[in-house]
Amino acid sequence: MMDFDKKGILARAKEAQASTVVMDEGLRAYMLKVYNYMATGILLTGIIALISFKMSVVTDSTGAITGFTNIGNALFFSGLKWIVMLAPLGIVFYMSFGINKMSASKAQTVFWVFAALMGLSLSWILLVYTGVSVARVFFITSATFGAMSLYGYTTKRDLTKLGSFLMMGLIGIIIASIVNIFMKSSMMYFVISILGVLIFVGLTAYDTQKIKNMYAVSDSGELLGKKAVMGALTLYLDFINLFIMLLRLFGQRR
């Protein structure tokens, strides 16, 4: 009887170990796909932003902006700028509410379109800040994001309660930002930027853990593909917003 129990225990232990190995390998592949999509999206955004900026401005031999092309006038000073600014937000809502009806390949395509439109909408950054300071803040953002995402992936602490607190904070700074459009307070602008950095640093860890916990071995390849795209979209938004908040604090204006 004892031998039978030992064999049963060993068999269950081996089965559990095998399941853990499958889970670990699948989770790593899933998270790698999320990060690859996100990184490619950011790269696409950066390329489109740079091309849009170069096509929009006229510069002298020193690189100083001396005027705008027809593209620049349309992109920065006409009604088109509102379409360019709001289109990515529309796509975020479209993906958030329509992902269940999409195929994984369509979700990827929509994500690439979103990243490209974000490049157009963020091209103003190169108009306001020097290229050197943009590059510097980008590397600071990358290091900060990487550290917090790693923490979110490896920590055993449940960050669910932190997520609720951060979402309330996010709503707060959105409202404050709208109010400050009319108040034009430099102090409020500074405070919003500080709080924004703290909130998106926290959201990076929280969202990484949430994306990790969404993985399930039993999911089909199609479902995992859509989860990876939505995870990439979430982390992309965390990265971009953290980048903008840090740029407000450390960016050097032209």
Regions found by a protein language model. Give the residues of each.
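A hydrophobic alpha-helical transmembrane-helix feature that marks the membrane cores
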Residues: M1-R254
